[in-house]
Amino acid sequence: VYKRQILSEMKQEFPRINEAYTGRPYRYVYTISFGEFDDPSHVSSNTLLSHDVETGNSESYSFGENWVTGEVIFVAREGAQAENDGWLMSYVHALDGRPSKVVILDAQHMAEGPIATIHLQVRVPVGFHCNWVDYRKLRTHYS
């Protein structure tokens, strides 16, 4: 059943869900946004968002005006029972050309910010899409 629902007035893009829920009802949607810099002069996304489509509640975490986020992906915790039991991961790129980083946030507590940050040695070019593939699934399919 299709139902149109506005989750936020902020401009957002690259919606993602827990991929285990693809093709069936889901509760949580993860996006990126311009955040508090939601104006035409700021041309890069700097905020990750989590939307609960059942309650209408949203959480966000902003990296500030000198950073650009990539598409956020959901990675389920092994053995997870809840749809949002896992992590959110994204590349974060410095606008001044400094090395990029990968951030990991607890999907159930996104507003608390990253629980881990991987500081890369190089600047990864800004891209659009990301994916996560569990190495065990790769090994099963390609061994």
Task: Please report, for each region that a protein language model flagged, where it lies by residue.
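Short, small-residue-biased leader/transition segments that mark boundaries at the very start
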Residues: 1-2
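Surface loop/turn motifs at the tips and blade-to-blade linkers of beta-strand repeat domains
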Residues: 6-11, 61-67, 118-123
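Structural signature of eukaryotic scaffold interfaces centered on beta-propeller domains
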Residues: 9-26, 71-84, 126-143
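Functionally critical, mid-to-C-terminal surface segments that flank or help form catalytic/ligand
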Residues: 13-36, 43-47
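Short beta-strand elements that form the blades of beta-propeller/WD-repeat-like
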Residues: 26-39, 83-95, 137-143
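Conserved active-site loop/cleft motifs that coordinate metal ions or position small ligands
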Residues: 29, 87-92, 101-105, 114-119, ...
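Generic long, charged, amphipathic alpha-helical segments
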Residues: 40-92
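Beta-propeller blade signature
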Residues: 44-56, 99-119
